[in-house]
């Protein structure tokens, strides 16, 4: 499980809020958060950079989430996570994990959220120009200042995570508690040619998480709709034309996995999307899928995945480990 400096344990499914308050208006955003909380959810994920790609969107996610938390008086009842250290969108080669950059991002995030601390602070990207010691020291200091309770990494390689863990242990500093990366039942390769890639679960990374039981917080856990209603109808018709959703995931292996997911779902009387999420919850290490939606019904559907107990035979049929 995630080890937090808190008595609150995060719910197994996390709510992502990337375009809340921007493309997803305030009313719809609040309705989704209400439904998530009503279903037992308490783990919220946002980021300093979110919606910077939209006109007047930068900061809207953190502000909208913060307003909802204050309105409902829930700050001490939830796990609040945000991310910083993301490169400028027009200069993705630029590392931003220096002490002054993290200080700036964190301060602005706390101000937008209207809180004194966050439970988890993720570094949105690595900064290979910085030693892991410098990064570990920076985040450890913010924990000592009670501005964050724990920290994690997002889109880091296993090698750099191992280096940070070893450094923190060696010098009695605070280690990262989890890795946030792309992970769903559908495989997707990391674009290693990208200057600062979004990293996706692969067989080697999966093996490391299995060996160490290091927790994974999984973005794109629903593969941008690849296991949704539209794609299931498309699969039942024999895959005519392009995939209605999740086209970046489409391929022979994922189509086979989609068909098996549909079969398991039909046998159980649940949805393929619920089965796909349940697979992540049945891994040999802790996985906390992040869901992202603007529809209340999708939140309720996703949260029910926690009640599905898959058998070893079903997991084998689904080939639920990343591509070998």
Region spans (language model):
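A short acidic, helix-capping loop that chelates divalent metal ions and anchors anionic groups
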Residues: 50-54, 87-93, 187-192, 298-301
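Short, acidic/polar
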Residues: 24-36, 97-113, 162-166
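Beta/alpha (TIM)-barrel catalytic core signal, keyed to glycine-rich beta->alpha loops juxtaposed to Asp/Glu
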Residues: 126, 130-323
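Short, well-ordered coil/turn segments that N-cap beta-strands
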Residues: 8-13, 40-42, 74-78, 115-119, ...
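Active-site groove signature of glycoside hydrolases
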Residues: 110-131
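Alpha-helix N-cap and loop-to-helix initiation/capping positions
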Residues: 24-31, 56-60, 64, 93-101, ...
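N-terminal small/glycine-rich loop or linker at the start of catalytic domains
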Residues: 4-23, 81-94, 117, 122
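N-terminal binding-site loop/beta-alpha segment at the start of enzyme catalytic domains
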Residues: 1-77, 144, 223
